[in-house]
Amino acid sequence: MIVEELKLINYRNYEQMNLKFHPRLNVFIGDNAQGKTNLIESIYLCSAGKSFRTNHDQELINMNKKQAYIHVKVKKVHSDVHIEVRLNSERKKDLKVNQIPLVKMGELLGNLNVVLFSPEDLKLVKEGPSERRRFMDREISQISTKFYYTLSQYNKILQHRNKLLKYNKGKEIDIEVWDEQLAAAGAWLIVYRRNFIKKISILAKLMHRKITESIENLEVIYEPNVKVKENDEVDVIKEKILQNLKENFNVDKQRGLTTCGPHRDDMILKINGLDVKTYGSQGQQRTAVLSLKLAELELVKGEVGEYPILLLDDVMSELDSKRQHYLIHNLKSVQTFITTTMMETLKDLKPEDRAVFYVNKGQID
């Protein structure tokens, strides 16, 4: 999978921009606040349908403009894909794939797979479970639209149940209808997440051993809020969720929200048996996240048959020279986009192996 071309009109600080990319490595270099990350963001937007920096589309439109437009041409193994995103300050965004309008956001997923690594990803090990759930859900959604729609359904049912608990002080019999639906969707979420962690944990462990030269052992552990066994089938999991909901009803009613279920799941990272969040050094935390990101590349390749695009936003300065070298020289099969303020770490790459774009105030040389 390769992003061949990118076109921007009135996107962030770019009034009009047309770029063609190198099939392996593309480097956006320039001082801070010049627009490097905006380029990475626009590619990500064409993959996920939303920014990784803001939930407000208005912020993506050039100041004093009403619309913005993004177009990417993606070369895949069996076909070319054209993705268009039109942002409007007065209505929701319009999405097209090969000139066909998309009705649902989920229809965009899988047309352009990306793995993003930015300084914000350290939240995976530094902050609470919501960051780790977001990681799991984002990556699974790229390879399974069924999971994406099940997650959307679960969240809608959860909102209804919480409203009943909070505003109407619903009786248990009123809640039971929602419990059945919530448990059915939730059971599938647990199955998908469990399978995902099983696969990515093996890959992340291998990546981590390569990076640390087998000195450290990384474990990625799925920790569902509802306690299930490794071999529990979806029907068994559903019954366990229902039982939890019933047992927690009085607590839920008192708090006005649902206190158990997949929306409270977590993912634990351990190095040599110790929780990285609590006991890991800054370097170990970075390496654990890097290993996860590299594992994502292999997981997507295994699921869809080709590597996703790797987006590295201002992370080279976060890694030591050994990890920088490993990252740059072990991704020859993956098209990579890097934003950086200096070329020092990339100087030993041959000119024919990369393209360099100098970014200055929304202009590119």
UniProtKB/Swiss-Prot annotation:
A single GO cellular-component term on record: cytoplasm
PROSITE patterns, alphabetized: RECF_1, RECF_2
Disulfide bonding pattern of the chain: none
Main localization of the protein described in the UniProt heading: cytoplasm
Protein name: DNA replication and repair protein RecF
Job of this protein: The RecF protein is involved in DNA metabolism; it is required for DNA replication and normal SOS inducibility. RecF binds preferentially to single-stranded, linear DNA. It also seems to bind ATP.
Alphabetical list of InterPro entries matching this protein: DNA-binding_RecF, DNA-binding_RecF_CS, P-loop_NTPase, RecF/RecN/SMC_N, RecF_2
SUPFAM superfamilies according to UniProt: P-loop containing nucleoside triphosphate hydrolases (SSF52540)
Gene Ontology molecular-function annotations: ATP binding; single-stranded DNA binding
Binding site for ATP: G30, D31, N32, A33, Q34, G35, K36, T37
GO biological process, one term: DNA synthesis involved in DNA repair
Protein keywords: ATP-binding, Cytoplasm, DNA damage, DNA repair, DNA replication, DNA-binding, Nucleotide-binding, SOS response
Cellular compartment(s): Cytoplasm
UniProt record similarity statement: Belongs to the RecF family.
